[in-house]
Design a protein with these regions (language model features):
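C-terminal segments of enzyme domains that contribute to small-molecule binding surfaces
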Residues: 4-19, 25, 110-111, 118-148, ...
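Flexible, glycine/small-residue-enriched loop-and-beta-strand segment within the central core
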Residues: 53-148
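Short, recurrent motifs enriched in small/polar residues
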Residues: 39-46, 73-74, 78-79, 133-135, ...
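N-terminal segments that cap or nucleate solenoid repeat domains
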Residues: 35-57
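Short, charged, low-hydrophobicity "junction" segments
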Residues: 18-39, 59-63, 78-80
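A generic "structured core" feature
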Residues: 86, 155, 159-161, 165
Length: 232
């Protein structure tokens, strides 16, 4: 049997075109390196939408431990990832717990080691470095070994190139690359982007997505007309 035929979605009895069950941890039969993250991740302050997957040769089960770093519950920052995102091996989300106070001459965190070094520490010098929640939109592709810094917002439909370091917000349907990542190309013209954002196909009922896969996978925006664009 060819490798292509072995990578068969594990639909577990669902009707054709209904797609895989988003609550299955490993949706591709005989390919356990790919996993839907929503049923795999139970860590506090991490929210992940349906059908978003992570691909790792060691398995996706340790995504929260391996890929979401310095995420401490007492800080309260959230990682929010939308639906239908593709996250490649080695992608990292650096959370606000990694930040150091930068207003003084030294960035060394003396206070965390105690033994008197905590005396006189002003928590405000650290808390003002908090960047807020990290938010990834829907239908975002994050390439291998990409690094997403604290508080970044990545728009719907964006692509983050492999090994990029994303330090600023990414517009919807932009392709960013580099360290620090910059927009190298917009995937579509402004009119098309507006139509896609209005349609928000990722929020459609799953049966409607299945019926319209050719349009979603295609690039002909002229076929996206009401009532096709409505979620019902």
């Amino acid at each position: 049997m060819s490798p292509a035929r072995r990578l068969v979605p594990a639909n577990y009895g669902l009707i054709p075109m209904s797609g895989p069950n988003p609550n299955i941890k490993h949706p591709i039969a005989m390919h356990p390196r790919v996993g839907f993250l929503k049923p795999l991740v139970s860590a506090p302050n991490i929210e992940i939408g349906d059908f978003t997957y992570y691909d790792d040769p060691d398995g996706p089960d340790k995504f929260a431990e391996k890929c979401v770093l310095h995420h401490y519950p007492f800080i309260g920052d959230r990682l929010v990832i939308g639906k239908f995102c593709a996250i490649a091996e080695g992608a990292r989300f650096i959370m606000n717990g990694a930040n150091h106070a930068m207003s003084g001459f030294s960035t060394y965190p003396f206070n965390i080691f105690g033994h008197g070094w905590e005396e006189g520490f002003d928590p405000e010098t650290w808390s003002k470095e908090i960047r807020g929640d990290t938010i990834v939109g829907n239908d975002v592709w994050i390439g291998m070994d990409a690094v997403i810094m604290p508080g970044v917002q990545i728009g719907h439909g964006a692509i983050v190139a492999a090994k990029s370091v994303v330090t600023h917000d990414v517009p919807p349907y932009a392709i960013v690359a580099g360290n620090a990542a910059k927009v190298v190309k917009m995937r579509f013209d402004e009119f098309t982007v507006r139509r896609l954002l209005k349609a928000a196909w990722w929020d459609w009922p799953i049966d409607k997505i299945g019926r319209n896969l050719n349009a979603i996978r295609g690039a002909d925006i002229s076929s996206w007309r009401p009532p096709f664009e409505r979620a019902g």
